């Protein structure tokens, strides 16, 4: 009785159906709805990363915020734009007229296509590989058609277009993204003060974003919005008009507010920390701004030492101030040495103007180069500089200009393996020797040399006094002769690898967006991501719902060539499935697109989003085969390579490309297997 009631409820929910012809196949319709939801789930878990992966990776939005925005725009886009694209998936890949007398075969084929596509997309999501949902459903559709009707029903030109898109999409989008990012970097990012040029470019960027995305949405010809009745010249006129209006609003309203906000938040307080303080003395320091007073930071059970290091800049200014920094010194493990250190005077008040000369002849100048780093007991002391302080950022800039790659000492000196990229910066601050020293009489490995205490032949000790190793360690030890170096070839390889890692890290940090630049591009990237999500919902919901639409309309009308419109509630059903997949499993591919493939900043993320959207619009109108997923991956890789040649994970990119290559055959084989089961075991036709 209960099963009969459930059957009646499902039948009534599906509407008025032609039960006289297709009633025996109602089970196929119900099964199709279940598999279609799983397919929509897999699309949400994989393809939605195209829209918000870069925004999450650049830190503009959190993963939770991205899921909320994507859920809204994906659902709205699927309802408003999805009907048009579903027609292509339903009729554009195979010749449906061959199924006029065997409608049940077409229904079974739709189920097989959805199953094959869903399985491969879920597998790719598990492996964190972004693939094209369109290519999945195309391969699956071709797979079931080969089993059902052989080669005669397949439109092979579509398969050729897919193969071409593997190369055209990432290459074309990558070139356009690279050109846009080069423009942004040349005229904004590399300027001493990027704000003026950034504000001037802001109206242009907003206008391009609005114009391109609006044209893309209107050109799809969504019948629900009436866009199918608007001529091409009307679409162009509306898009250009909205873009110009947006540019005027941004120039007269947004830019003045943005300028005031930047001046208030960044210009008046440039990246300082409570470690900095000022004294009104005559100095040259136009970059750093003073703080009210010294701040001592206690370390539990340890020693707090205050080392005041006034900083000099290379450019003289009329109004100058002395800047000092308080260095925290952690606890010494040796009780005897701790007692000695407690009695030491570590407050340095008298600056002695000095500088550190690099091997290439450049100077990094400070008003206090602490020369007496080794005390009377033969100990080197370790000082921690907070990485968020203005002092650290100023020093980072100076050392970059002085080519830190040359700071590792002369050819006869062997540098130690450094724990992280902050070591050299702290060494320069404290005036410690830039050529790392080692013990003459020991053949300890670099890892052993970095232990807390090392006894040398001359009785000197090296004590680690830094309890914050995540920031920086100033390393020093006794000299090591050349013969010992030749005996430790493995150590030399480790040092060379670490030196390259340090220079790569320095290059990456230098290429990070300044706070004011990030503020300029943040909302732009969110805007492009929302537009992309809206268009993605309209395009990729068809990958999940297209076969279901064919299945439903064949069951309802009994005609495989029906011209009935796609029901809105079917599109909404697919949109809900996409959103659930995003919330449950979308973070995996979002991490690949936004973080694992290459680091992304707001400026590079905006370049990726806008250029890939422009590529899709141009290629679609010209008739070139294109894939949104491939465009985004190509843009991410090209911009990441421009920012830092070592920042791209080429092994991951290789895996992604291999996944693209096997998408069509794997989804096709799975679909063909399910179709063979239907044809020969269940339907027996």
From Swiss-Prot:
Pfam family, any one: PHO4
Localization annotation: Membrane
Record-level GO cellular component terms: membrane
One GO BP: phosphate ion transmembrane transport
Record bears the keyword Transport: yes
Region described as Disordered: 438-458, 483-513
KW Transmembrane helix (keyword) present: yes
Example GO molecular function: symporter activity
UniProt xrefs under InterPro entries: Phos_transporter (IPR001204)
Biased composition (Acidic residues): 483-496
Topology class, membrane: Multi-pass membrane protein
Protein keywords: Membrane, Phosphate transport, Symport, Transmembrane, Transmembrane helix, Transport
PANTHER family linked: PHOSPHATE TRANSPORTER (PTHR11101), SODIUM-DEPENDENT PHOSPHATE TRANSPORTER 1 (PTHR11101:SF46)
Recorded family membership: Belongs to the inorganic phosphate transporter (PiT) (TC 2.A.20) family.
Described function: Sodium-phosphate symporter which plays a fundamental housekeeping role in phosphate transport.
Protein's name according to its UniProt entry: Sodium-dependent phosphate transporter 1-A
Phylogenetic classification of the source organism: Eukaryota, Metazoa, Chordata, Craniata, Vertebrata
Name of the gene: slc20a1-a
């Amino acid at each position: 009785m209960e099963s009969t009631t459930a059957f009646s409820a499902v039948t009534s929910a599906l509407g008025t159906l032609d039960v006289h012809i297709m009633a025996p196949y109602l089970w196929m319709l119900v099964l199709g709805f279940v598999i279609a939801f799983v397919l929509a789930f897999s699309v949400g878990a994989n393809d939605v990363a195209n829209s918000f992966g870069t925004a999450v990776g650049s830190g503009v939005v959190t993963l939770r915020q991205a899921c909320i925005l994507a859920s809204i725009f994906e659902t709205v886009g699927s309802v408003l734009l999805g009907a048009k694209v579903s027609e292509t998936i339903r009729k554009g890949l195979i010749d449906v007229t061959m199924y006029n007398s065997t409608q049940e075969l077409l229904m079974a084929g739709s189920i097989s296509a959805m199953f094959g596509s869903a399985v491969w997309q879920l597998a790719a999501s598990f492996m964190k590989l972004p693939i094209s949902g369109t290519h999945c459903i195309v391969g699956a559709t071709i797979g079931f058609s080969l089993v059902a009707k052989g080669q005669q029903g397949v439109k092979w030109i579509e398969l050729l277009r897919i193969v071409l898109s593997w190369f055209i999409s990432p290459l074309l989008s990558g070139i356009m993204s690279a050109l846009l990012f080069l423009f942004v970097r040349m005229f904004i990012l590399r300027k001493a003060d990027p704000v003026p040029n950034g504000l001037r470019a802001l109206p242009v960027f907003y206008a391009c974003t609005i114009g391109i995305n609006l044209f893309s949405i209107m050109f799809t010809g969504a019948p629900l919005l009436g866009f199918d009745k608007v001529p091409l010249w009307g679409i162009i006129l509306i898009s250009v008009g909205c873009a110009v209006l947006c540019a005027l609003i941004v120039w007269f309203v947004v830019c003045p507010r943005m300028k005031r906000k930047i001046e208030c938040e960044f210009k008046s307080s440039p990246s300082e920390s409570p470690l900095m303080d000022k004294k009104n003395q005559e100095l040259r320091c136009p970059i750093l701004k003073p703080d009210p007073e010294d701040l001592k930071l206690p370390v539990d059970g340890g020693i707090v030492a205050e080392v005041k290091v006034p900083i000099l800049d290379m450019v003289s200014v009329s109004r100058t101030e002395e800047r000092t920094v308080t260095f925290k010194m952690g606890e010494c493990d040796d009780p005897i040495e701790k007692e000695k250190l407690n009695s030491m005077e570590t407050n340095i008040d008298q600056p002695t103007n000095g500088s550190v000369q690099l091997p290439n002849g450049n100077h990094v100048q400070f008003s206090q180069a602490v020369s007496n780093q080794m005390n009377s007991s033969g100990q080197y002391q370790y000082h921690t500089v907070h990485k968020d302080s203005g002092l650290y950022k100023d020093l980072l800039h100076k050392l970059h200009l002085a080519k830190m790659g040359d700071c590792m000492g002369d050819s006869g000196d062997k540098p130690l393996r450094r724990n992280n990229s902050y070591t050299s910066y702290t060494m320069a601050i404290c005036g410690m020797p830039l050529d790392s020293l080692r013990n003459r009489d020991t053949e300890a490995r670099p890892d052993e040399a970095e232990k807390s205490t090392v006894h040398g032949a001359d009785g000197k000790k090296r004590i680690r006094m830094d309890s914050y190793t995540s920031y920086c360690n100033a390393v020093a030890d006794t000299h090591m002769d050349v013969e010992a170096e030749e005996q430790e070839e493995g150590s030399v390889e480790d040092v060379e690898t670490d030196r390259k890692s340090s220079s790569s890290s320095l290059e990456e940090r230098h290429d990070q967006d300044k706070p004011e630049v990030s503020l300029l591009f943040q909302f732009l990237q969110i805007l492009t991501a929302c537009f992309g999500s809206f268009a993605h919902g309209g395009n990729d919901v068809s990958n999940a719902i297209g076969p279901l639409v064919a299945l439903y309309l064949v069951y309802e009308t009994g005609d495989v060539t029906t011209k009935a419109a796609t029901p809105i509630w079917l599109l909404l059903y697919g949109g809900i499935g996409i959103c659930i997949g995003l919330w449950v499993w979308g973070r995996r591919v979002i991490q690949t697109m936004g973080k694992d493939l290459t680091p992304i900043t707001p400026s590079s993320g905006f370049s990726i989003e806008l250029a890939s959207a422009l590529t899709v619009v141009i290629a679609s109108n010209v008739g070139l085969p294109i894939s949104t997923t491939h465009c985004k991956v190509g843009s991410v890789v090209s911009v990441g390579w421009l920012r830092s040649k070592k920042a791209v994970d080429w092994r991951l990119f290789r895996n992604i490309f291999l996944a693209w290559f096997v998408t069509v055959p794997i989804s096709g084989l799975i679909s063909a297997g399910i179709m063979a089961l239907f044809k020969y075991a269940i339907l027996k036709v």
